[in-house]
Amino acid sequence: MESAPRLDNKSRMSREVHVRFCEGLGVRFPRATRLVILCRSPELAVRALEIVGNWVADNGLTLHPTKTQVVDSRTNSFSFLGYEFHGTKHWPRKKSLQQLKGSLKRKTRRTSGDSLEWIIADVNRTLRGWFCYFQHSTRSSVYRGLDSWLRMRLRSLLRRRAGGRGVARDQTASFTWPNAFFAERGLFSLTTAHAKACQSSRR
């Protein structure tokens, strides 16, 4: 069970609430602190929320009214710090993917006058930063989907420069500019990076 309260002020959490990520006698929380408390049963989760609620009230703080909830992650998912959690699985939440795509769209407009090399270098900076945080997804399909979508964007840009029109989703565009074409030009692959990260974690 997850009880996910959010604290909305600077505070100090004592061992009265058993938050085990700190071994000191207290924990300093910055403004709008978010935390997840894992419990073995619904009853313990409700009790944990009650303890936290009493503690924050005693210290002049408040829990966020809509983001504080008790969730059984075995049957329902919940969002936390950009990820979606369900049981033992976790992946970038929909909003996180939308934000990344929005940033990449602005960098890969078909009307861009920048060279492909410059665009790829610019895109790579965004991809590496995003992957640094979101490399822990248990769904590898997330990375494959983003890689495919980005190559489609770049093919559409190249097709326009070659005098063509429309979004390059057809086989002709994939044949003209295959995946290897972009790899040879240094396009960062989320799929490849995730595979390497998984290999490293198994060592």
Task: Show where each model-derived region lies.
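Non-catalytic terminal/accessory segments
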Residues: 1-203
